[in-house]
Amino acid sequence: MAERPARLAPLANGVVFVVLATGMAVSAAFVVVPAFGSETIGFDFRGTLWDPAIAIRHGLPPYPDAVTSEVEVGNPALYPPLLMLLVVPLTLLSWSAGLAIWTVIQIGAVVGALAILRVRDARCYVIALLSLPVVAGLGWGNATLLLVPLAALAWRWRDSWPRGGLIVGLAIASKLFAWPLIVWLLATRRYRAAGLAVAATVAFVVAPWALIGFDGMTTDPGLLRVSEC
C-alpha cells in the first residue's frame, strides 16, 4: 500500500502544475493582455529607453525638463543613461523590430535568472513566464525584468565580493530602486562587496553620463521628485 502513494505523487504533481499553469495563463489572457493595445504595447520601453536612445543618437538631450507638464507627457526617461546607451544600436532598426528584439532579451533575462540559480525543473520556467508580473513586464517592455538575472547573480556570487559588488552596482546604475541590495550586503556583513557596489554604482552612472556630455545629470534628481508628485 505504501507504494501506491509514491506512484501517484508524480501524477498529483502534474495535475497541480497543469491547474496552476492554466490558471496563470487564463489570468494573463483576461487580466493583463486586454489592457494592452497598439499604443500601449512596449509603452515603458518606448518612453524610457527607445525615444531617449534616439535622442542620444542624434545628439539631443534624452531627458525632459524637470517640470510637471513635461513629466506627465508620455512616459519620459527618469533613470541614469546606462540602459539608454545599450539600446542605441536597436534604434537603427524599425520600432517593431527593435521591440521584438527587446522582448526576446526580456524573456532571456527571466529564463537566464532561473538558470543562474540552477533551477532545472522546466515547470518553474513555465510558471515564471506565465506569472502576471512577467507578462505585464513583457507587455510594457519594462526594463525591470533585466534586473532579475542581476539579482540572481548577486545571490549566486554573494560569497565573491568582487563579482557580487560589481553586479549590485550594475543593477543599481540600471535602475536606482535596486539600492536595497546594498542594504542586504551590509546586513549580511559583506562589507567589501557593499563598498565595491557603491563605487561600481558611481562608475556605472557617471561613465555613461560622461559619454553624453553629462546632459541631464543635474536635472535628473528634479525629474524624480516631480514624477513622485
Go through each PLM region and give its residues:
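Membrane-interface alpha helices of multi-pass inner-membrane proteins
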Residues: 162-186
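Primarily membrane-embedded glycan-assembly and transfer machineries that use lipid-linked glycans
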Residues: 1-164, 188-229
